[in-house]
């Protein structure tokens, strides 16, 4: 039990080895009128539970923000944290090959090339064709 300002009581539970938890950092705040829950394993959402009302899901980048909250948002809503880091890793691997004059075949599996781009374009074309033809199966080899 913890006691905060204005005699507010709380409960703090900390564990690095709790059964069924991986690296879950969770904050739950309970009050007389409701509760607020957030988990770092699902960081784009917070759940607001008001007594006698349906739960509300609050999204990162959603409409319930104040102007100061935008300062900590680096990516648009719907993009997961780590999105930018994924691209940064590709650039880092490419720079490593170029700057250190490594054998390009050594890290080639990590880097997308023209063939990867062609496969993606075929997939997009097949998806559009399928959609335009009543969702029929479209083989990528036919594109």
Predicted stretch roles:
Residues 117-131:
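C-terminal hydrophobic helical "lid"/dimerization subdomain
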Residues 94, 117, 134:
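Hydrophobic, well-ordered secondary-structure elements that form the walls
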Residues 24, 107, 133-135:
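Short secondary-structure junction motifs
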Residues 1-24, 28, 115:
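Rossmann-like dinucleotide-binding domain that binds NAD(P)(H)
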Residues 1-6, 33-111:
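C-terminal glycine/acidic-rich active-site capping loop/insertion
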Residues 129-143:
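C-terminal capping/lid region of NAD(P)-dependent oxidoreductase domains
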Residues 107-115, 141-143:
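C-terminal/domain-terminus segments
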């Amino acid at each position: 039990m913890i006691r905060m300002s204005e005699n507010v009581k709380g409960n703090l539970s900390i564990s690095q080895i709790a059964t069924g938890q991986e690296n879950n950092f969770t904050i739950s705040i309970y009050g007389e009128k409701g509760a607020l829950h957030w988990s770092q394993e699902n960081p784009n959402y917070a759940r607001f539970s008001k007594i006698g009302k349906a739960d509300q899901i609050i999204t990162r980048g959603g409409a319930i923000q104040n102007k100061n909250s935008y300062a900590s948002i680096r990516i648009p809503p719907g993009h997961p944290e780590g999105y930018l880091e994924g691209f940064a890793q590709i650039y880092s691997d490419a720079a490593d090959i170029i700057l250190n004059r490594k054998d390009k075949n050594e890290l080639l599996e990590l880097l997308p090339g023209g063939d990867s781009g062609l496969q993606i374009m075929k997939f997009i074309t097949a998806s559009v064709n399928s959609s335009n033809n009543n969702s029929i199966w479209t083989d990528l080899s036919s594109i």
